[in-house]
């Protein structure tokens, strides 16, 4: 926001919980009041609780599904009239690399993020030719507060890159009307291909690291 303001842009900060109907309505109203219209919606809110499914509470499961899947769908629905009025608008859904390669101890999070990815794909086709494009972003491990309690490193498939790198790639995707932005480099691309062509091999690879991964992510929570 500071960089945008220094560059001459108009910036307005809004504090709201988009996981609630009131928060979504407030966000949209204040954005429209401040900007006079809407050209882009970026669904970037997220929450996670890692761990075995049977050790994850119902409230934690519902919270992840709400903030990672339901809230973006409902906020997009509410924003569509303003986006259509723009004539050339975009919805950007920030999902996760786990939406492409399911990882143990992230079953609900993977389900929510994969659901958001397919929502974006379907909506892109629904809105084709109507002035609203949809971009789906798949970050790899990103150095944000959400990852503070995740102790898994690159040896377990959890590398880190600066949030600024993901932001720059997302901006490039917006400027080029891309369908997808997938982070993680060639290593991630190879794993995606292997998961598609030989999922059993990925199962075996993850089996070998499962004990270490479970220990490393047991406290990973950002809800």
Features from the language model and the residues they span:
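Residue(s) in the substrate-gating loop at a strand-loop-helix junction
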Residues: 96
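Active-site loop immediately N-terminal to the catalytic Tyr-X3-Lys motif
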Residues: 54, 103-107
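The beta1-alpha1 cofactor-binding region of Rossmann-like NAD(H)/NADP(H)-dependent oxidoreductases
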Residues: 15-27, 58
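Conserved NAD(P)H cofactor-binding loop of Rossmann-fold oxidoreductase domains
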Residues: 44-49
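C-terminal helical subdomain
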Residues: 136, 152-190
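Substrate-binding pocket helix/loop in short-chain dehydrogenase/reductase
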Residues: 52-53, 57-63
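Active-site helix of classical SDR
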Residues: 76, 112
């Amino acid at each position: 926001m500071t960089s945008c303001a220094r560059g001459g842009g108009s910036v307005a900060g809004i504090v709201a919980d988009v996981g609630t109907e009131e928060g979504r309505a407030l966000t949209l109203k204040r954005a429209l009041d401040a900007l006079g219209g809407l050209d882009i919606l970026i669904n970037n809110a997220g929450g996670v609780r890692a761990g075995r499914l049977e050790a994850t509470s119902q409230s934690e499961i519902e919270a992840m599904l709400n903030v990672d899947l339901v809230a973006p769908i409902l906020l997009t629905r509410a924003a569509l009239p303003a986006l259509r009025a723009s004539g050339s608008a975009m919805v950007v859904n920030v999902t996760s690399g786990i939406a492409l390669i399911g990882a143990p101890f992230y079953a609900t999070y993977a389900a929510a993020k994969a659901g958001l990815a397919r929502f974006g794909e379907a909506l892109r086709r629904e809105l084709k030719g109507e002035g609203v494009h949809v971009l789906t972003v798949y970050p790899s491990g990103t150095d944000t507060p959400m990852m503070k309690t995740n102790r898994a490193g690159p040896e377990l498939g959890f590398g880190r890159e600066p949030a600024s790198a993901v932001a720059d790639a997302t901006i490039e995707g917006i400027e080029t009307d891309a369908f997808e932005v997938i982070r993680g480099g060639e290593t991630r691309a190879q794993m995606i291909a292997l998961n598609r062509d030989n999922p059993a091999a990925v199962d075996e690879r993850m089996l070998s690291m499962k004990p270490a991964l479970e220990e490393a992510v047991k406290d990973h929570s950002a809800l």
